[in-house]
């Protein structure tokens, strides 16, 4: 059936900000879908609140609304645009839940708007735990014994009858939010209470635990004619009980017999047909390792994280196909864009193994609970392709960028056997390293399989890796052993460690023996049909399938896995850089390892190498492609860290030179630059040992800001207020610095702002100055930013522009740079300069309408700003006010303190734009799900130095009609100023204490700042964690409180007696 002609305008709902469980994969799927619909001549209206996405670029849809994805705003857009239909299946859980809300509100019926792809009944049947169970029973598909609970008591009653352990799964949530495995009634009470609070329909499923079964996933597609097919099947290395987003995953399945595959395949196809889904769907199944018994775990009636992985693993663009099916096309009518000859109904075949490993944020959150379970904790993931399991696994491990290049963590050698066993039984993010350590110690793999429930087949592959390690130790400089190691994914660096040589010596030895990788094509059909895809992976075999063209090429290094401090913003810049390279007439080559992103969509660049971003892997690609140069500015710290090693190998780095990057990042070098320009910066010095650091701090006076050099996202950065704290910090932070010293600066309290600038070597373009709402001391990535600045004087702005221009020229900057300033006593100080694209590039590109990464790339390719048609200096801002707000994922991470400071903690961002600051702020808060009700109780518990400021804020809350509650010290300060306050008891003081009131829903807003006293700190942590668990808006910076008050005041009217 050809495409539908009765609909013309389609709304696509995006997935909003990046949070744990909902990351960049939806930017990739949403972008694909919008472009597919435009290709079919539909008018596309997009709604998304996340500015850091390619999806929200003007050319992706006909109308792009960067607005909050809430009933209020989406309804307003529907009334304005009157689309014929909505496609909600590409915006993750956010898109689905929004579709449900719109439907229940009645607006879809009122405006005669239909839902495409997945009918509401199917969303309900898949997401509502009760309906899902009923449907499976009707189909005769087995589900674990379970009960639905709407209260904690109902949950406890089921578990008492069924026996522990049980799994808790909240309805209509994503990434396992609010779920968990309970082994005791107390655990069940806590998990269920949290799960009910986080489920939009206050419903959880309590099911008998089948932890230990094999977890298998099928990505399936179906069209309106009931044609259904499997795109990809995948097997989790970790058994059921660990969320699939936190599991190592292999595609295709590795340990199933053909009969088992067919059994599960039939079940998956039967389910998509029963749900009548038109598009893509993900089915998760549990298979008993010792029989043919299986259970259906869950069904996602939409494009998911696994769909992005399946798309990249097979080369089959699921989201693009799903969008076309949603508008009526059938699988046998859609061409497969990879082969160009076959149709979409052909099931992809793989002649390689794909391995996905999650990337967790525990390097940032050292106190977090690292145990893995049914609630997802990873922020991102990497994927690697190899000809065998060993190769794919080792390539994935070195793609993670966690400071290791092999499945070996030297620190584990000293762990005793009891601890080792415990870490094997209770899985953490680093279980793979504990497994290999156990195998090195001679633990039999059968025993390990029994302990971990990981299939012995996978453990045998790890054993094989360890046997190769032993061969390398005993056969140094042996080409045969090296060949075996390389074919199984070993890095040159690993071989160098076993041979006690340098990485360059191993590389030279390898190349002298003509041992180099070839590149194979990902073609969806295992070589059965001719294919044109420019999508490759490296392996040590014989035939090279990547043909080098005569055209001059430029290699762009991507940013690797998404983690805190390095998010999708850098992928955004990478994709724009590629567009500019292509427009300039070069062949654009991307190298990246992240399956979730737009940059690893093979249709974006002229060639895509899906490889780890290490010096060895990058040099191998350069050796083959011989590009005119490499661009490292857009790949975050990942790419910047490769600049010097590449330059040392004689590779041309395009844009700002490595020496100039070093002048900006090395403290002593930068001091020389800034002194020569007479630009003020906070007093400070560098220390490479503890004694020096303490001496510097004594000289400067406390508080001081301490940080290692060369980091991104403020890793290990802290404001230290006294000598004992600095002593403690130096023992913990110096480890981070790898031959780089620690910087100790005087900490200036003041307003912070930042600038992104583009320089062509001669002239400087400054698209905008962003003012931070939170004062200095809160990491720029966690601050709300406003453009254009609302409270900076013209003189201060002129000074910022002057310093930016001088620094860009002095540092010979070519391309992007980002500078952070603090304004202290009306004087502008430079805090830091980063000679690369920063995380604010997408936001500033959107609000100024300047495609900054493209302009910078053209400058890097020798086109001056004047030739590009840009005036220099500060660009005049438009009429609107734009606010960028951070979004956090604290509800997914136990034991992570939500207190904001110089170390970055947010996972994503949203944006609000309007004619006034108050309106823009309101939209940003709504988009970030920080909804402050218009009345209720505000709890204030603040440190002594914040009390004067808190009194002023409390007066404003009181004037708006809020009731004030405060802990003893804060209450005294407020009553002294004549404010009516209810004093609440601190924690552990019985029924009416603070936490009980929060749990009972008596508190609507929590304002908490922290003193240095440890006990207060512990109380504060409990208060903050409880407010996150119960979804109470929490503010730990008074500037944010002032911003929210500005919003509330703008929406209220004065009521006064005569």
Swiss-Prot record:
Q: Which cofactor does it need?
A: Mg(2+); Mn(2+)
**One Gene Ontology biological process:** glutamine metabolic process
Residues annotated as binding Mn(2+) 4 are: 832, 834
Q: Which UniProt keywords apply?
A: Amino-acid biosynthesis, Arginine biosynthesis, ATP-binding, Ligase, Magnesium, Manganese, Metal-binding, Nucleotide-binding, Pyrimidine biosynthesis, Repeat
Q: Name one GO cellular component term.
A: cytoplasm
Where do the annotations place Mn(2+) 1 binding? 284, 298
Ranges for the region named Allosteric domain are: 930-1058
Residues the entry annotates as binding Mg(2+) 3: 820, 832
Recorded catalytic reaction(s): these are:
hydrogencarbonate + L-glutamine + 2 ATP + H2O = carbamoyl phosphate + L-glutamate + 2 ADP + phosphate + 2 H(+)
Q: Cross-referenced SMART domains, in alphabetical order?
A: CPSase_L_D3, MGS
- Binding of Mn(2+) 3 occurs at 820, 832
User: Which parts of the sequence bind ATP 2?
Assistant: 707, 746, 748, 752, 777-780, 820, 832
Q: Under which main EC class is this enzyme filed?
A: ligase
Its Enzyme Commission number? 6.3.4.16, 6.3.5.5
The entry marks the following residues as binding Mg(2+) 2, namely: 298, 300
Q: Which residues bind Mn(2+) 2?
A: 298, 300
Cite the MGS-like domain residue spans from the record. Answer: 930-1058
Region (Carbamoyl phosphate synthetic domain) residue spans: 547-929
- Annotated ATP 1 binding sites: 129, 169, 175-176, 208, 210, 215, 241-243, 284, 298
Chain segments carrying region Carboxyphosphate synthetic domain: 1-401
Binding-site list for Mg(2+) 1: 284, 298
Q: How does it assemble?
A: Composed of two chains; the small (or glutamine) chain promotes the hydrolysis of glutamine to ammonia, which is used by the large (or ammonia) chain to synthesize carbamoyl phosphate. Tetramer of heterodimers (alpha,beta)4.
| Family named by the database record | Belongs to the CarB family.
What's noted about domains in the record?
The large subunit is composed of 2 ATP-grasp domains that are involved in binding the 2 ATP molecules needed for carbamoyl phosphate synthesis. The N-terminal ATP-grasp domain (referred to as the carboxyphosphate synthetic component) catalyzes the ATP-dependent phosphorylation of hydrogencarbonate to carboxyphosphate and the subsequent nucleophilic attack by ammonia to form a carbamate intermediate.
What name does the UniProt record give this protein?
A: Carbamoyl phosphate synthase pyrimidine-specific large chain
User: Where does this protein come from, organism-wise?
Assistant: Lactiplantibacillus plantarum (strain ATCC BAA-793 / NCIMB 8826 / WCFS1) (Lactobacillus plantarum)
Source organism phylogeny: Bacteria, Bacillati, Bacillota, Bacilli, Lactobacillales
The gene for this chain is pyrAB
């Amino acid at each position: 059936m050809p495409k539908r002609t009765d609909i013309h305008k389609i709304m696509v709902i995006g997935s909003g900000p990046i949070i744990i469980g909902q990351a960049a994969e939806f930017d990739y799927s949403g972008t694909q879908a919008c472009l597919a619909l435009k290709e079919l001549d539909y008018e596309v209206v997009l709604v998304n609140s996340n500015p850091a996405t390619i999806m929200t670029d003007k050319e992706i849809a006909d109308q792009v609304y960067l607005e909050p994805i809430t009933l209020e705003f989406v309804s307003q857009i529907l009334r304005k645009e009157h689309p014929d239909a909505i496609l909600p299946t590409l915006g993750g859980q956010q898109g689905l839940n929004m579709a449900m809300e719109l439907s229940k509100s009645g607006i879809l019926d009122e405006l005669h708007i239909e839902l495409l792809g997945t009918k509401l009944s199917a969303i309900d049947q898949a997401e509502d735990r009760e309906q899902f169970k009923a449907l499976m029973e009707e189909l005769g598909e087995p589900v674990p014994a379970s009960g639905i609970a709407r209260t904690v008591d109902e949950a406890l009653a089921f578990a008492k009858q069924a026996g522990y352990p049980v799994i808790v799964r909240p309805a209509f949530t994503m990434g396992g939010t609010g779920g968990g495995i309970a082994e005791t009634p107390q655990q069940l009470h806590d998990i269920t209470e949290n799960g009910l609070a986080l489920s939009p329909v206050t419903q959880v499923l309590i099911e008998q635990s089948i932890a230990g079964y094999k977890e298998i996933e099928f990505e399936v597609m179906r069209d309106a004619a009931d044609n259904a097919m499997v795109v990809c099947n995948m097997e989790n290395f970790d058994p059921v009980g660990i969320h699939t987003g936190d599991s190592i995953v292999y595609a295709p399945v590795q340990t199933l017999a053909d009969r088992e595959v067919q059994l599960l395949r039939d079940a998956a196809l039967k389910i998509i047909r029963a749900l009548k889904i038109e598009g893509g769907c993900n089915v998760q199944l549990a298979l008993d390792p010792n029989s043919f018994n299986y259970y259906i775990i869950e069904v996602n009636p939409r494009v998911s994280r696994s769909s992005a992985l399946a798309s990249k693993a097979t080369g089959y663009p699921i989201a693009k196909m799903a969008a076309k099916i949603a508008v009526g096309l059938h699988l046998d009518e859609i061409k497969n864009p990879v082969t160009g000859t076959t149709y979409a109904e052909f099931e992809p075949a793989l002649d390689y193994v794909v391995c996905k490993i999650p990337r967790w944020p525990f390097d940032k959150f050292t106190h977090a609970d690292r145990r893995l379970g049914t609630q997802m904790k990873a922020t991102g993931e990497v994927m690697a392709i190899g000809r065998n399991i060993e190769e794919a696994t080792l390539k994935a491990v070195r793609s993670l960028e966690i400071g290791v290049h092999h499945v070996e963590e030297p620190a584990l050698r000293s762990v005793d056997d009891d601890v080792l066993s415990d870490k094997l039984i209770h899985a953490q993010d680093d279980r793979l390293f504990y497994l290999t350590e156990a195998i090195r110690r001679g633990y039999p793999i059968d025993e390990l399989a029994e302990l971990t429930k990981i299939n012995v087949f996978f453990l045998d592959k790890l054993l094989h890796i360890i046997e190769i390690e032993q061969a390398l130790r005993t056969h140094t400089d042996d080409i045969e052993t090296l060949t075996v190691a390389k074919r199984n994914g070993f890095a040159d660096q690993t071989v160098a460690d076993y041979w006690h040589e340098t990485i360059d010596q191993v590389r030279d030895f390898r190349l002298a023996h003509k041992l180099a990788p070839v590149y194979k094509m990902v073609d969806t059909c295992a070589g059965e049909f001719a294919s044109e895809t420019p999508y490759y992976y490296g392996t040590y075999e014989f035939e090279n399938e990547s043909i080098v063209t005569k055209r001059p090429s430029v290699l762009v290094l991507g940013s690797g896995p998404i983690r805190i401090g390095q998010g999708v913003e850098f992928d955004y810049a990478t994709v724009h850089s590629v567009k500019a390279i292509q427009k300039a007439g070069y062949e654009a080559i991307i190298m990246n390892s992240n399956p979730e992103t737009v940059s690893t969509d093979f249709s974006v660049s002229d060639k895509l190498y899906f490889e780890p971003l290490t010096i060895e892997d990058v040099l191998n690609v350069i050796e083959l492609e011989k590009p005119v140069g490499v661009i490292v500015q857009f790949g975050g710290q990942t790419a910047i860290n490769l600049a010097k090693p590449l330059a040392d190998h004689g590779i041309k780095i395009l844009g700002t030179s490595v020496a100039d990057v070093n002048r900006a990042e090395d403290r002593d070098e930068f001091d020389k630059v800034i002194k020569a320009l007479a630009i003020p910066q906070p007093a400070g010095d560098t220390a490479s040992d503890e004694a020096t650091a303490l001496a510097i701090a004594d000289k400067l006076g406390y508080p001081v800001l301490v940080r290692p050099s060369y980091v991104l996202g403020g890793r290990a950065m802290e404001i230290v207020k006294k000598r004992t704290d600095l002593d403690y910090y130096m023992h913990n932070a110096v480890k981070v610095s790898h031959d780089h010293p620690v910087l100790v600066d005087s900490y200036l309290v003041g307003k912070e702002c930042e600038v992104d600038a583009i320089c062509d070597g001669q002239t400087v373009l400054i698209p905008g100055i962003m003012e931070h709402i939170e004062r200095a001391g809160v990491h720029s990535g966690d601050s709300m930013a406003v453009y254009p600045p609302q409270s900076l004087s013209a003189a201060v702005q002129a000074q910022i522009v002057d310093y930016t221009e001088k620094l860009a020229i002095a540092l010979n900057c070519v391309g992007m740079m980002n500078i952070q300033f603090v304004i202290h006593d009306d004087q502008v100080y430079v805090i830091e300069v980063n000679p690369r694209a920063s995380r604010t590039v997408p936001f500033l590109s959107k609000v100024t309408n300047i495609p900054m990464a493209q302009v910078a790339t053209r400058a890097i390719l020798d086109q001056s700003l004047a030739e590009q048609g840009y005036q220099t200096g500060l660009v005049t801002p438009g009429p609107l006010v734009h606010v960028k707000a951070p979004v956090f994922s604290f509800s997914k991470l136990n034991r992570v303190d939500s207190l904001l400071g110089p170390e970055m903690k947010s996972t994503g961002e949203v944006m609000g734009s309007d004619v006034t600051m108050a309106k823009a702020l309101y939209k940003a808060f709504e988009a970030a799900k920080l909804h402050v009700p218009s009345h209720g109780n505000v709890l204030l518990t603040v440190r002594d130095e914040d009390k004067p400021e808190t009194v002023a804020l409390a007066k404003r809350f009181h004037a708006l009609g809020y009731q004030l509650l405060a802990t003893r010290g804060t209450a005294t300060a407020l009553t002294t100023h004549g404010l009516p306050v209810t004093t609440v008891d601190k924690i552990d003081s019985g029924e009416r204490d603070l936490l009980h009131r929060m749990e009972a829903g008596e508190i609507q807003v929590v304002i908490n700042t922290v003193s240095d006293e440890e006990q207060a700190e512990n109380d504060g942590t409990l208060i903050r964690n409880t407010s996150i668990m119960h979804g109470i808006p929490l503010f730990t910076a008074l500037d944010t409180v002032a911003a929210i008050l500005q919003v509330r005041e703008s929406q209220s009217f004065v009521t006064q007696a005569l």
